[in-house]
UniProtKB/Swiss-Prot annotation:
It comes from Escherichia coli (strain UTI89 / UPEC). Keywords: ATP-binding, Cytoplasm, Ligase, Nucleotide-binding, Purine biosynthesis. One of its GO terms (biological process) is adenine biosynthetic process. Transmembrane segments: none annotated. NCBIfam families: purM. The keyword Calcium does not apply. Its EC number is 6.3.3.1. One of its GO terms (cellular component) is cytosol. Pathway: Purine metabolism; IMP biosynthesis via de novo pathway; 5-amino-1-(5-phospho-D-ribosyl)imidazole from N(2)-formyl-N(1)-(5-phospho-D-ribosyl)glycinamide: step 2/2. This is Phosphoribosylformylglycinamidine cyclo-ligase. It holds the Pfam family AIRS_C.
């Protein structure tokens, strides 16, 4: 009989002990996100969550997203602590535009070789994003897949479920001629346009860690976590008649605003109402990017746009700014049968 080496899962590149160590490391931060509706803890086959009792006719709203190639930049710069906030933001901001309160969040973390410190930093960021948005991190999947990813490269995806009263769903159907558009300032490029960002860095030969912009490294501007608008917007919805909300993500102004406009309406954006944050001026100049392409790729300093009746504007601005948002009037809605749904002038 020929002697053969006894193989283990670890020999194949999967370290179960590292996975267990990660769970032990993150339990504390995950527990801080717990809502009263959540039943059980980490480790079950499925997460249980009751619906909040305040809803008479609750409708569940779900969303899933990633952070695109911003993740590649974060890995290249070895900055993993805020990418989890980005992941949560991309999901919960999509939910709140429909009036939904985020309830719970799950994440998927996949890597070729699990580094407990890196994964812990990412998941701690996810927990922070959940705290900022008031939802519970109820579970996730950490997949160590040798041969699928290069070295310690990783990818993340997020999944969120929220709830809204059926009669209070915001779907844009109430938008009408004369409505005013309010902008909520962004924290930077958020999590969109990073393939172009990375191309600009490559072509310009710029090192984002040594290049200074507004007194801090360019890397700080590019990796600033996506702003989470949930709590401010939910309070606004309670107190103001909001007709529509657009989350400015991939596709920028041209593609996201029309998603919430009824037929025969047009959004007219006043370009003079705000100054682009310096990072967008740098990207446009360094990449020689045309204005139309900037508005199609980046948020250019505007993370959300809210449509509401003109008499509600002052109240809405006061509420939003009191909650720490940078909010201003950015445009109006007018009746139009033009195929151009958004005009920036």
């Amino acid at each position: 009989m020929t002697d053969k080496t006894s193989l283990s899962y670890k020999d194949a590149g999967v370290d179960i002990d590292a996975g267990n160590a990660l769970v032990g490391r993150i339990k504390g931060v995950v527990k801080k996100t717990r809502r009263p509706e959540v039943m059980g803890g980490l480790g079950g086959f499925g997460a249980l969550c009751a619906l909040p009792q305040k809803y008479r006719e609750p409708v569940l709203v779900s969303g899933t997203d990633g952070v695109g190639t911003k993740l590649r930049l974060a890995m290249d710069l070895k900055r993993h602590d805020t990418i989890g906030i980005d992941l949560v933001a991309m999901c919960v901001n999509d939910l709140v535009v429909q009036g939904a309160e985020p309830l719970f969040f799950l994440d998927y973390y996949a890597t070729g070789k699990l580094d407990v410190n890196t994964a812990s930093a990412v998941i701690s960021g996810i927990a922070e994003g959940c705290l900022q948005s008031g939802c519970s991190l109820v579970g996730g999947e950490t997949a160590e897949m040798p041969g699928m990813y290069h070295g310690e490269d990783y990818d993340v995806a997020g999944f969120c479920v929220g709830v809204v009263e059926k009669s209070e769903i915001i779907d844009g159907s109430k938008v009408s001629d004369g409505d005013v558009l309010i902008a909520l300032g962004s924290s930077g490029p958020h999590s969109n346009g990073y393939s172009l960002v990375r191309k600009i860095l490559e072509v310009s030969g710029c090192d984002p860690q040594t290049t200074e912009l507004d007194g801090k490294p360019l890397a700080d501007h590019l990796l600033a976590p996506t702003r989470i608008y949930v709590k401010s917007v939910l309070e606004l919805i309670e107190k103001v008649d909001v007709h529509a909300i657009a989350h400015l993500t991939g596709g920028g102004f041209w593609e996201n605003i029309p998603r919430v406009l009824p037929d025969n309406t047009q959004a007219v954006i006043d370009e003079s109402s705000w100054q682009w944050p310096e990072v967008f001026n740098w990207l446009q100049t360094a990449g020689n990017v045309e204005r139309h392409e900037m508005y199609r790729t980046f948020n250019c300093g505007v993370g959300m746009i809210i449509a509401l009746p003109a008499p509600e504007v002052d109240k809405a601005l006061a509420l939003l700014n009191a909650n720490g948002e940078n909010a201003w009037k950015i445009g109006i809605i007018k009746t139009s049968d033009s195929e151009q749904r958004v005009v920036i002038e």
